[in-house]
Regions:
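Catalytic machinery of carbohydrate-active enzymes
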Residues: 1-152
C-alpha cells in the first residue's frame, strides 16, 4: 500500500454508527489496522452518545461524532458527512454497515483508494472492495469485522 505524500502516514476512516456493543467489537478492526500499519491515523465515526467510551483509546486517533440532530435532519446529515470526508483526505474508508446512509461517506470519497464495505446489491458502485460478511455462519461479529481488512 502506498504512503501519503507529506507526513507519510496513512489515514483511515472506520464507520460504525449506533449500537454501543457493535462499536465496542469494531475496535478490534481499529487495533488490527494499528498493528499492521503502525503509523496509520485511525478516525472512528460514532454517534455522540457512545463516543466517550472510545475517546483516549490508544488505537483510535480521533472520534468523529454525529449528534441526534445531525442524524434527524437529512440535509444536515449530508453536509456533516461531506465536511468529515473533505476535512481529511483518507486513504482507507471502512464502512462496517454499508447502509444507504453510511454509503454517503463513500460517495463523497471517490478518490479514496480503498473504499471497503460489506457486499450488498446497492454498494457495488461506491465500494471498490466489497467483502462477503455472511460467508461463514460460524464467524462471530469481530471476525466478520476483521474480514473487512482483507483487501489491505
Amino acid at each position: 500500500m502506498a504512503r501519503k505524500k507529506g507526513d507519510g502516514s496513512l489515514r483511515a476512516l472506520v464507520i460504525r454508527f449506533r449500537r454501543v456493543g457493535d462499536a465496542v467489537l469494531a475496535v478490534a478492526a481499529c487495533s488490527s489496522l494499528k498493528r499492521s500499519f503502525p503509523d496509520i491515523r485511525v478516525d472512528f465515526v460514532l454517534n455522540e452518545a457512545i463516543a466517550p467510551l472510545f475517546e483516549g483509546h490508544p488505537d483510535i486517533d480521533r472520534v468523529v461524532t454525529f449528534t441526534d440532530t445531525d442524524n434527524a435532519n437529512p440535509w444536515r446529515y449530508v453536509r456533516r458527512v461531506f465536511d468529515v470526508v473533505r476535512k481529511t483526505r483518507y486513504d482507507i474508508l471502512i464502512d462496517m454497515r454499508a447502509t444507504p446512509r453510511t454509503l454517503l461517506f463513500s460517495l463523497f470519497s471517490l478518490r479514496t483508494p480503498y473504499r471497503i464495505g460489506t457486499r450488498k446489491p446497492y454498494s457495488r458502485l461506491l465500494h471498490n472492495y466489497r467483502v462477503a460478511d455472511r460467508i461463514d455462519p460460524s464467524l462471530d461479529m469481530v471476525q466478520r469485522d476483521l474480514l473487512l481488512l482483507s483487501p489491505l
